[in-house]
Amino acid sequence: MEGSGCGTIGGMSTPAIAIVGMGPRGISILERLSARMDDSSDPITVHLIDDAQHGAGRIWETDQTKTLCMNTRAGAVTLFTEPGSTVDAPVLEGPIQYEWIQLLRGEGDDISAAKRELFEQHPPATHIAEDYREELAATRPESNPSRALYGEYLRWVYDVIITRLPKSISTVSHFSQLETIAEDGPVDVLRLADGSEVRADATVLAYGWMVPEYNEQEKQLAASGLNWIAPNNPVEQDYAAIPGGEDVLVRGLGMGFYDIMALTTIERGGAFVEDSSARSGLRYEPCGDEPNFIISSGRGYPYHPKSEYGELPPTMPRRRLKKVIAELSGIQDTDFDAQVWPAIARDSYEAYITTLERVRPDSLLRPRADILEVIDATDPDELGAAIAPMVTEPWDMNDLMYQIAGFTGDIVELTEHIAQSMESDIREAAAGHDSPIKAALWSLSQSRKPASILGAEGRYTRESRTGRYSQVMSFGQMIGSGPPLFRVRQLLALVDAGLAHFLGDHPTLSIEADHFTLTSGPRSASAPTLVDAFMHRPDIRTAGDAMTRCLVDSGRVRPFPDHGQPTGSPETDGPTRRTVHPDGELDARLHIVGIPTYSQWPDTTISPMPGTDPLMLQETDKTAGSLLAVVRS
């Protein structure tokens, strides 16, 4: 197609696979390819394409500030398949991140011999032990490592894979961005930003988040001439352009905001110091160059902190949900609202009652068995009211779902209202195993993955997917995928230092000649800088990059249809992850994995967790098998 880079060009002579994106998924695909081959296999060339650091990828680059931390715990992430995994190629046992840290410290007698042997055969770069000395010494399984340290782990895994490649696999590294893909008969021609071309018999796109084109409001923001920090991952945003010493408006109170908060306080020389007299437990000592944040979001309330258990989080029983999944697995047109949500909600309230009975048994005014009978007989939206007369500490999940809805006070009053709730959030998170509220919320949070698997590939009704399911997934994100506790303590310390204020939920924006104005209910605030501290979901229908537009224009992808309604994800074939054309035919060579396919496949943003048969590693294994099948056909 003229002008799109999708035209037809001449032939090719050698079998080759192109992996676009050399972060965790790209690494895993290379390892899964290697697991399927040996020195005597027919030779192939694998082109490794990414303008970011190969192995780490953009998000986990090792040269970034150590101020930013993972949202995942050290003992809950791996990149190696494990014995018993649902994969076709042989397993390569390797240390999870925390075991790798233990081995760096000279510990790990309880780590399996196979993992220790792999580590000893491939010792990490010597600078890691020195550069991360303090962090390595302090890290526990439940710690949140710096993103840079996780990048070092990924780079080590990548180096292990490269070193262990059979002689039949040769690799070529390209440190450039893919711009377009053209079909040339039986091959793909990938044009890179540096002007080079890669010719491939099979291609996989494993590139993570892709930014869509600006919507109408964002086009106005871009044309305003004012200081607007557009939505993106914080490592891609120009946080240095956020001015210190003046008001800054923010939209977003999730992980993106917490990153921006850290980068404009700690990274600029401010300090959070322990202070037992402060309600957050911290006192902020300003550097003078931090912004004065005025913050809003869809809910208007900050993401909740993760609990501190002193160990990895517990696995909740969720007995009702497990029963529902066993009954409904694979069934089309499941109504999430009517058939799944009641089990999730009742499991959550059972977790509350069970923990309350354990830590404060006198709080139950009726026997636990009687309360559970009421839970099972009550509409899920009425559970809080139903159990209230039976306990001395009533709790209603609805209060958290709509924490500031209808609040009519001014910014000062709302800020204090939220600050008091944050103080409670901090207290509950610090209680760990002994918080009934956190037990209830963790039960709901852990229900998200199995519920999303149950409804994958459009198995939930369209109405329930866009309704209750979407609501529950969003709420679960806020209560279960929030920051480490220390980040929420830091935000409350900023509130008490007069440097963070809350505007409210569902803000509306107006653009004036010299400032922006955000309004939420009766509250409004103006400033010359607006930070959008969130990320849009990738959407191939409104792609902001030439490569995705090229694929759409050339008919190599189509939106995944959810009950006839197009979504933002490219549709892919389950067994192979090959893309689907508008006419329903599978593409001969092109594969897409990971985050962009969120509408069709579950759990696309979650790192592989040890002991869970991670879906990401199942996907990369399937994809590697298909890539080899394509080049050998």
Go through each PLM region and give its residues.
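Redox-cofactor-proximal catalytic regions of oxidoreductases
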Residues: H54-Y132
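Flavin (primarily FAD) cofactor-binding/catalytic cores of flavoenzymes
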Residues: E2-T65, R133-V631
